[in-house]
């Protein structure tokens, strides 16, 4: 019998930056090149990091850790996370971002506008670790710590940073210090952050999409909305809707395709392919309501995929089917959040043709 392989955890960019800082500061104090650094992670355990490079330049030291995403590598997997530490004229620990670490240009993020995109917990980790090293050696001098990512600007193109107003590089992130393989918490956190940025930039209408292709169609449909109003929710329909409601978004437009939106119409709010099957009897009932022939209704009931149903209804020229399906999506969304907002739904083909749309205002409309 095949045994399930245990997935290997990785480390966050914040943990890598902290380990690199510890190595660089230790080398600056002792003059000894460091090959590893052990730090305490927020998750409550110690971890030892290999130091890829440790270069001493008299009054400053540069140490590098290679980011290891474990068995769930993201865009930053394999990136060099560099900490350059030097003595400061002022007391205290002065942390900033260098080349390849983004700058915050829009409100709504946990870091103020104008500062390096080093999130609060990595900041705290770096400060505390640097303080511990200074105390260990009985040193009271101030230090400058610059975190850089040589290829950060390129890597950032594969992330949502530009949309969130983080320009020039990646963010130094991580609340736990470790990356749990295929956990959804990071994706959910990015959805919340995107809604917060939209809200902080004056958007009370956001467009939530199931992926990049849907988003492209949505941007064409809503050209008047700013870029930060568009949020990729992936499979997390219910979660995203609830966060929009919680954060005071008044109008939510959902844009997607047959496969996932057939599930939303049924009231399924987590639309991963393995989350729940599509109810073809439900789609057949909509086809009947839309005036489809008995033969077409029977064919819908026997279909294999929602896309196939979409093609059948298109060939039959039955636009009403798509309008009713979109209306069901709106009703499901309003039920999920308990009303109190306007919900629009637009349904597209894979090629970008608008099949139908609907709008519902509040729960009882």
UniProtKB/Swiss-Prot annotation:
InterPro entries: CbiD (IPR002748), CbiD_sf (IPR036074)
Catalytic activity: Co-precorrin-5B + S-adenosyl-L-methionine = Co-precorrin-6A + S-adenosyl-L-homocysteine
Enzyme class (EC, first level): transferase
Pathway(s) this gene product operates in, as recorded in its UniProt entry: Cofactor biosynthesis; adenosylcobalamin biosynthesis; cob(II)yrinate a,c-diamide from sirohydrochlorin (anaerobic route): step 6/10
GO biological process, one term: methylation
Keywords, ordered alphabetically: Cobalamin biosynthesis, Methyltransferase, S-adenosyl-L-methionine, Transferase
Keyword Lipoprotein annotated: no
One MF annotation (Gene Ontology) recorded for this entry: cobalt-precorrin-5B C1-methyltransferase activity
Enzyme Commission no: 2.1.1.195
Family: Belongs to the CbiD family.
UniProt-listed NCBIfam families: cbiD (TIGR00312), PRK00075.1-1 (NF000849)
Matches recorded under HAMAP family: CbiD
Protein name, per record: Cobalt-precorrin-5B C(1)-methyltransferase
Encoding gene, per UniProt annotation: cbiD
């Amino acid at each position: 019998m095949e045994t399930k392989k245990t997935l290997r955890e990785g480390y966050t960019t914040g943990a890598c930056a902290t380990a690199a800082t510890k190595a660089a500061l230790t080398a600056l104090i002792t003059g000894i090149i460091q090959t590893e650094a052990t730090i305490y992670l927020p998750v409550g355990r110690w971890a030892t990091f290999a130091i890829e490079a440790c270069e001493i330049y008299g009054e400053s030291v540069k140490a590098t850790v290679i980011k290891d995403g474990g068995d769930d590598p993201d865009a930053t997997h394999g990136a060099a996370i560099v900490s350059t530490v030097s003595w400061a004229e002022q007391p205290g620990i002065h942390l900033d971002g260098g080349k390849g670490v983004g700058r915050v240009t829009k409100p709504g993020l946990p870091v103020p506008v104008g500062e390096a995109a080093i999130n609060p917990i990595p900041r705290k980790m770096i400060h505390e670790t640097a303080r511990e090293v200074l105390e260990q050696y009985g040193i009271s001098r101030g230090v400058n710590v610059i975190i850089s990512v040589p290829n950060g600007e390129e890597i950032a193109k594969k992330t949502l940073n530009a949309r969130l107003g983080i320009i020039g590089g990646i963010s130094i992130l991580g609340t736990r210090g470790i990356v749990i393989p295929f956990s959804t918490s990071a994706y959910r956190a990015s959805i919340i952050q995107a809604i917060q940025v939209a809200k902080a930039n004056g958007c009370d209408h956001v467009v939530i999409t199931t992926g990049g292709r849907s988003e492209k169609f949505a941007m064409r449909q809503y050209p008047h909305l700013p870029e930060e109003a568009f949020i990729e929710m992936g499979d997390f329909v219910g979660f995203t809707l609830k966060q929009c409601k919680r954060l005071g978004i008044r109008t939510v437009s959902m844009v997607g395709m047959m496969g996932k939106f057939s599930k939303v119409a049924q009231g399924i709010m987590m639309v991963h392919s393995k989350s729940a099957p599509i109810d073809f009897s439900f789609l057949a009932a909509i086809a009947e309501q839309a005036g489809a022939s008995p033969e077409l209704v029977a064919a819908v009931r026997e279909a294999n995929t929602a896309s196939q149903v979409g093609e059948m209804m298109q060939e039959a020229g039955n636009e009403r089917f798509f309008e009713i399906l979109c209306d069901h999506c709106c009703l499901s969304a309003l039920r999920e959040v308990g009303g109190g907002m306007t919900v629009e739904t637009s349904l597209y083909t894979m090629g970008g043709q608008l099949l139908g749309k609907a709008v519902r205002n509040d729960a009882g409309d």
